[in-house]
Amino acid sequence: MSEQFVAQAADPNAVPAAKQSKTLTWGVGEESIDYVASASHLDIYDPQRVLEGKMFNVSYVASAVNGEAVDAASRPVTFAFNGGPGSASVPINFGGLGPRRVVSEGEQFASARYEVVDNPGTLLRETDLVFLDALGTGWSFVADGYDTKRVYGLEEDARTFCRAIIRWLDEHNRWGSPLYIYGESYGTMRSAVLMRYLGEAGVPLAGVVMLSAYFDWSQNLPGN
């Protein structure tokens, strides 16, 4: 199943309103997965209960695999994010892990008509997926009047992601699921700090995936 998308004039800064969900079916060969795709914001509060910002997320939660209902309580959940810093999670979603992908040969920029197909390599076959956009990227934003110095920075960023993950688990009642975090590029540096904050908050991780790990900035500086 494939679709064609053509760019249309729209407000590039328009923020989606309330949570939006749609039931879809992924199918490749004889395999099929019924799942609910949702887009929403997570309200992130600091320890003083002051709103830091709203973190945009896209989630894919399976309801049936090959026609058989799944037990959400035991199905893993993986929280995934790109790096930058300054990148939303669109590349790792539609370019790698999500149930849908944009067709590309990877050798040139895509034309204005984009073909989107079921992704045969999606991790949805093994785990539910939640893609998180860091505050200030994608449709995530820092709350009006909130000091951005308390949000931007390695430690600050990781704390915000920790609060977002806890918020999502609370809202979806998934504390019994095996939990994973999946970071790419700078996202691996985030993960290295995030796993500590999650541990201190009592969030048990079943595993951490580091894609294109990037821990030492000095290796990429001129003269090194």
Segment roles from a protein language model:
Residues S2-A7, R49-R150:
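N-terminal cap/lid subdomain of alpha/beta-hydrolase-fold enzymes
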Residues A14-N66:
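N-terminal cap/lid segment of alpha/beta-hydrolase-fold proteins
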Residues S63, R167, E171, Y197-A201:
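Active-site catalytic microenvironments for nucleophilic, acid-base chemistry
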Residues P99-V103, M195-N224:
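A catalytic-pocket lid/entrance helix-loop region that shapes and gates access to the active site
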Residues D133, Y180, G207-V209:
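Residue in the alpha/beta-hydrolase core beta-strand immediately N-terminal to the catalytic nucleophile
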Residues L154-H172:
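Helix-loop module immediately N-terminal to the HCX5R catalytic loop
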Residues N173-Y186:
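Alpha/beta-hydrolase fold nucleophile elbow
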Residues G187-A192:
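Catalytic nucleophile loop
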